[in-house]
Amino acid sequence: MSQRKYFGTDGVRGEVGGPVINAAFALRLGYAAGRVLVRRNASRQGGRPQVLIGKDTRISGYMLESALEAGLSAAGIDVVLAGPIPTPGVAYLTRALRLVAGIVISASHNPYQDNGIKFFSAEGTKLPDEVEAEIEAALEQELGCVKSEDLGRARRMSDSQGRYIEFCKSTVPHSLDLHGMKLVVDAANGAAYHIAPHVFRELGAEVYAIGVSPDGFNINKGVGALHPESLAEEVKARGAHYGIALDGDADRLQMVDASGRIYNGDELLYAIVRDRMRQGKVEGVVGTLMTNYGFELAMGRLGVAFERANVGDRYVLEQLLARGWQFGGESSGHLLCLDCHTTGDGTIAALQVLAALHANKASLSDWIADLRLYPQVMINVPLQPGQDWKTHAGLAAARAGVEAELAGRGRVLIRASGTEPKLRLMVEAEDFALAQASAQKLADSLG
């Protein structure tokens, strides 16, 4: 794939008012994407192509939505405005309404000062690389406008949230009845603020909701999946059975039990996979380079194949599709259940966990008791300009020694930071002291 100027691994993202997240660029991006989609759907019957736009609750969403809408209309695309809705909700509605593409305006777990724009295909999956490349090329052309009779229209979709709520509920058996269960749901003042509490209430749970008062500036601020400690306190204070924390665009999940214990993505994925094993539905699972070694060992004990992808749910999805598997995720809480949805979905993942516990009459701590996560130690070492750590003899020797010592009892991961001149040295081992000593050996070898 050729070098991209604008698109990263998760669409276009940056600080509002910066080079790419501004009204002028969004207008151009809407027009460029619109021209590509019109050309690719020239033989489509039934009028102009339609594109869905959804967003989270950032103040900049209004500006970017209007600019994208104008650009798409100028290219001859009809626009459906879904309003605030989770990223996976855009994927679902794009597919359900047979639209040619979906657009999400969100920077996920980032603060309100950032925003992003990413695309879904008509199938509710990430836009193919070749289509992104065509949009990049179209961005280099002048902004134009189709003839007046070919301009696109825009309409607001009044029932987008209700449709998505029903879809979420449809992913669990009708026998799942949450009456008698008390939940705290934290929507991070983000896209799921109206949706997530309703999903669990309509299945019978008593729900106390936090992070459901967005003001355009408080998305992810001290709440949500990046701050599960506040949820843990709420769960204990209210005597709830579980807490559910989503991030700003609701594609990430963390959970808390009645004792205040926080469960990360590895633990929640294990809960889902173990239940699907009971149903005979698991061929393999994809994690990432950061997935805990204890999870890998647990998959081995279950007899489930396990593979690691690069960090990022996009890469997990690519491996799942390539292998024909259905389950994968990241420690951060991006969980994919492709038997339910085409993309990662925090609300649906939480439902799968609760359905597993309900079906097996188990608590979350008991259900994942066989999963033992290994202590992890990370040391960041500054890299000197021009220093090639891959050919550093001292580091290579230290790594060989550490890996020999840890054989079957841990692992080593060494990778350069993608944002700063640092080398990240990560060690997981049976006990913290061993992990810490091993990581320090690696760091000292670079001294």
From Swiss-Prot:
EC number assigned by the record:
5.4.2.10
Keyword list (alphabetical) reads:
Isomerase, Magnesium, Metal-binding, Phosphoprotein
Kindly report, in one word, the top-level EC class recorded for this enzyme. isomerase
The record, for Gene3D superfamilies, names: Alpha-D-Glucose-1,6-Bisphosphate, subunit A, domain 3 (3.40.120.10), Alpha-D-phosphohexomutase, C-terminal domain (3.30.310.50)
What GO terms fall under cellular component here? Answer: cytosol
GO BP terms? carbohydrate metabolic process; peptidoglycan biosynthetic process; UDP-N-acetylglucosamine biosynthetic process
Reported cofactor(s) = Mg(2+)
Q: Matching Pfam families, A to Z?
A: PGM_PMM_I, PGM_PMM_II, PGM_PMM_III, PGM_PMM_IV
Does the keyword Cell division belong to this entry? no
- Give the source's domain of life in one word: Bacteria
What about PTM? Activated by phosphorylation.
Phosphoserine modification, residue list: 108
What does the record note about the cofactor?
Binds 1 Mg(2+) ion per subunit.
At which positions is Mg(2+) bound? 108, 247, 249, 251
Q: Where is the active site?
A: 108
| A GO MF label | phosphoglucosamine mutase activity
Establish whether keyword Lyase is in the entry: no
Q: What does this protein do?
A: Catalyzes the conversion of glucosamine-6-phosphate to glucosamine-1-phosphate.
Name the family.
Belongs to the phosphohexose mutase family.
HAMAP family attached here?
Answer: GlmM_B
Q: What is this protein called?
A: Phosphoglucosamine mutase
Protein source organism: Bordetella avium (strain 197N)
Q: What is the lineage of its organism?
A: Bacteria, Pseudomonadati, Pseudomonadota, Betaproteobacteria, Burkholderiales
Which gene is the coding source of this polypeptide chain? Answer: glmM
